[in-house]
Amino acid sequence: MIQTQSMLDVADNSGARRVMCIKVLGGSHRRYAGIGDIIKVTVKEAIPRGKVKKGQVMTAVVVRTRHGVRRADGSIIRFDGNAAVLLNNKQEPIGTRIFGPVTRELRTEKFMKIVSLAPEVL
């Protein structure tokens, strides 16, 4: 469960290393975001010569959370940390590689590109 001020790792090669959630999109007073939800983030740490710079405000999709996601069969998939993938204005990933596993819940029309780039889908 990601909320405002939550710090997330970046799971792509866009140049950002760490981002902070500044808004959960989808509803006027929505508090939490889970896996597959879109959030507004600001870049807190970035590498030199990356595609994004520190202080930039971006859109991102949550791909891993410590809270996890519950499946229909009752199983829960949790991760060691919270991670997001940065998106451009067309909701496409900025990076060309995805690091770490992603869940099957991202397998929608919007995020098939992220699922296909990921090394492992749980």
Swiss-Prot record:
GO terms for molecular function: large ribosomal subunit rRNA binding; structural constituent of ribosome. This is Large ribosomal subunit protein uL14. InterPro entries: Ribosomal_uL14, Ribosomal_uL14_bac-type, Ribosomal_uL14_CS, Ribosomal_uL14_sf. Keywords: Ribonucleoprotein, Ribosomal protein, RNA-binding, rRNA-binding. It comes from the Bacteria. One of its GO terms (biological process) is translation. SUPFAM superfamilies: Ribosomal protein L14 (SSF50193). Pfam families: Ribosomal_L14 (PF00238). It comes from Pseudomonas syringae pv. tomato (strain ATCC BAA-871 / DC3000). The gene is rplN. The keyword Amino-acid biosynthesis does not apply. Binds to 23S rRNA. Forms part of two intersubunit bridges in the 70S ribosome. GO terms for cellular component: cytosolic large ribosomal subunit. Belongs to the universal ribosomal protein uL14 family. NCBIfam families: rplN_bact (TIGR01067). Part of the 50S ribosomal subunit. Forms a cluster with proteins L3 and L19. In the 70S ribosome, L14 and L19 interact and together make contacts with the 16S rRNA in bridges B5 and B8.
